[in-house]
Design a protein with these regions (language model features):
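Active-site beta-loop-alpha junctions enriched in small/polar residues
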Residues: 20-22, 55-58, 100-102, 134-138, ...
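Gly/Pro-rich active-site loop or hairpin
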Residues: 6, 30, 66-71, 106, ...
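Glycine-centered flexibility sites
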Residues: 13-16, 91, 100, 162, ...
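Hydrophobic faces of well-ordered beta-strands that scaffold small-molecule active sites
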Residues: 17-19, 50-55, 95-97, 131-133, ...
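N-terminal pre-domain/capping segments
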Residues: 1-92, 120, 158, 186, ...
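Active-site acidic/histidine proton-transfer and metal-coordination neighborhood
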Residues: 3-4, 42-46, 60-162, 172
C-alpha cells in the first residue's frame, strides 16, 4: 500500500514523496474518497509531504497529449486534470508534464501544436500548481532536450509553467546536468536524480557534488526527487531509497 511506502520513506529520513498516478497505488479512476483520505492521513501522521505528482503516460490507455486522435488527447488532458485534483488533495505543489510523442504518420509540427494546446489547457485548469515540463529523451521523441523545454515554455507562456529534468535522461543524451541547471535558472522547478541504469545517486558516474553546487548557484528552491531502482527485478526498494538519501544528505 502507498501508506506503507510513505511510512518507510519517512523512517529513512525523506522530507517528501513524489507520487506517480499509476496503478495499483494512485491511479485516479481507482481511488475512492476514503483511499484519498487514507493517504492524506499517512502523510500527516508521518510528517512527510507530497512533493509532486506524475501522471502515468505510457501503457494501458496511453495518455498521449500529442496524439493525432482528438479523443485520445482529450482523455489525456482529462487525466492530467484528475491528477491536478489529487495534487490539491495531498498538497503537492508540482504536477509534471510529459509532452507525449510524435507517432508514425504525423509531423513534428502537428505533434508540437497538439502538445502545446494540451499544456495550455492543463495550465489554465491548475493555476495554483506548477506545471513542470520534463524532457524525456529516453522514453519519447517530442520534448527531447533543454532547448525543447525552453521553446515550449516560451510558446505557451503561462506564469505557472516551469521546467524540470532527470539526470538519467541527460546521461542518455551524453549531456552535462549542470548545463541544464544554469540554462534554466529560476525556471527550474523540479528535478529527478538517478545514476546509470537508474541506480541511486553516488553509485555511478554523475557528478552530484557539482549538481548541488549549481542548484545553490541558481537558488533552486524545489525538491530533489529520486527516480531510481526500476531497472531490474531483483531490487530492494528500501536499500535503494536509503542509499540515495544517505549519499545526498552527505553532500548537501
Amino acid at each position: 500500500p502507498l501508506e506503507e511506502v510513505i511510512r518507510r520513506l519517512a523512517r529513512i529520513g525523506y522530507d517528501g514523496i513524489e507520487i506517480g498516478a499509476a496503478a495499483p497505488h494512485a491511479y485516479p479512476d481507482y481511488l475512492t474518497s476514503d483511499a484519498i483520505k487514507s493517504v492524506s492521513r499517512a502523510l500527516d501522521d508521518n510528517g512527510i509531504v507530497c512533493s509532486s505528482m506524475l501522471p502515468a503516460p505510457g501503457g494501458g490507455a496511453g495518455f498521449n497529449v500529442a496524439s493525432a486522435n482528438p479523443l485520445e488527447r482529450a482523455a489525456a488532458v482529462d487525466q492530467y486534470k484528475k491528477v491536478a485534483d489529487l495534487c490539491r488533495e495531498w498538497g503537492a505543489p508540482t504536477l509534471m508534464y510529459i509532452a507525449g510523442w510524435q507517432i508514425f504518420g504525423t509531423s513534428r509540427k502537428d505533434a508540437w501544436s497538439w502538445t502545446s494546446e494540451s499544456l495550455n489547457e492543463i495550465a489554465e485548469f491548475a493555476p495554483d500548481l506548477t506545471i513542470a515540463i520534463e524532457p524525456t529523451s529516453s522514453d519519447s521523441n517530442l520534448i527531447d532536450s533543454c532547448d525543447d523545454v525552453i521553446e515550449l515554455m516560451d510558446q505557451v507562456d503561462k506564469p505557472n509553467i516551469g521546467a524540470m529534468f532527470d539526470t538519467f535522461h541527460t546521461l542518455y543524451r551524453n549531456e552535462v546536468p549542470t548545463d541544464y541547471i544554469y540554462r534554466l535558472g529560476k525556471r527550474l522547478k523540479h528535478i529527478h536524480l538517478a545514476d546509470l541504469d537508474r541506480g541511486p545517486p553516488g553509485s555511478g558516474v554523475v557528478d552530484y557534488v557539482s549538481i548541488i553546487q549549481a542548484l545553490r548557484d541558481v537558488e533552486y528552491g524545489g525538491y530533489l526527487a529520486m527516480e531510481i531502482g526500476f531497472n531490474r527485478r531483483n531490487v530492494e526498494p528500501d536499500d535503494m531509497a536509503r542509499r540515495a538519501h544517505d549519499y545526498l544528505r552527505s553532500i548537501i
